Amino acid sequence: MRTRTQCNAALLEGSTVRFIGTATIGTDHIDSTYCAEHGITVVNAPGCNAWAVVQWVVSILAQINQHASFALTERPVGIVGCGAIGERLARLLEIFHIPVFRCDPFLETASPFRYTSLERIGRECSIITVHTPLTHDGAHPTYHLLDAAFFHSLKQKPYILHAARGGIVDDYELYEAAQYRRIAGYYLDVYEDEPDVAPALLEAAKLATPHIAGYSIEGKLAASRAIVKAVGEFFGWQIAEPQLEEKEDKTFIVGHSIGDLARTYDIVHDSRTLKSAPQQLEQLRIQYAFRHDFRNYHFGNQALERLVQDDC
């Protein structure tokens, strides 16, 4: 099922559904409380498209590195949410000696010296990238995590990158922060009122893509395999694993710089396409030609090669 499908009481009431499989990382489109109360098993595919989202971020970092007044190695990148995507991104950046501040209150308890607060990230980071799930309750809700108070507290005029879920960042306050130069600019792949997006929000973005940061061939295959396996285990079926005809030789990239990695994905093209037809966001997303992510490449940088290939 797609994230656009809201699996809640309105859809499920009176049905015989026992299992819901979503080939996505997020589950905010599923009413997990209702499902638990009615004995419906919910399975998602965490980490399936993590490298595709990391690729999206890296492509933006290469753009920033070309135009900013500082080098990436000179300023810390604040990563908000260090699950499947955030932690992979952090490890990749550390290979290139880019300082990283990790923020994840769910992980901070176990490793307090490894993580820092959102407030510190706001004070000290020149680039902030968001990778949390969207939650409205619990110990650390993320709805409007980046709100007016956050943007007014910023000290470094950072770049804001957002490819998690619409609603984690208050889009209106993000736009206002850019207009009043509290931030250096923003890059978006998700939107609070998606698929209806304010034209001004898109126009002011440095780059904007139609919710496709995680759309890679390798990610789609990984998600399909995970859900097929889960369905088989739940119903006791033997199901053939989805296969992809892989190239005999993966493309080789030196991989000694962020710029090298950015050549694997033309994010500027995707942004131009959306900005030229913002009302077509949903159609652009549906018709998107899935790209290859880092798992399709071999790297001369051995540390990077190990990080990516050991995760395949």
Summary of predicted features, one role per range:
Residues M1-A68:
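Phosphate/diphosphate ligand-binding glycine-rich loop within oxidoreductases
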Residues C7, L107-P199:
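Rossmann-like adenosine-cofactor binding region
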Residues S15-F19, G39-T41, S111-E119, L202-P210:
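Active-site regions of enzymes building and remodeling cell-envelope glycoconjugates
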Residues S15-R18, H38-T41, I98, Q156-P158, ...:
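A short helix->loop->beta-strand "cap" motif at the edges of active sites that frequently abuts
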Residues P46, V54, T73-E94:
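Glycine-rich adenosine-cofactor-binding loop
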Residues V54-A68, I95-F96, A205, R225-E233:
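Oxidoreductase and adenylate-handling cofactor-binding alpha/beta cores
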Residues I95-P112:
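NAD(P)-binding Rossmann-fold cofactor-contacting core
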Residues K157, A163-C312:
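Rossmann-like dinucleotide-binding domain for NAD(H)/NADP(H)
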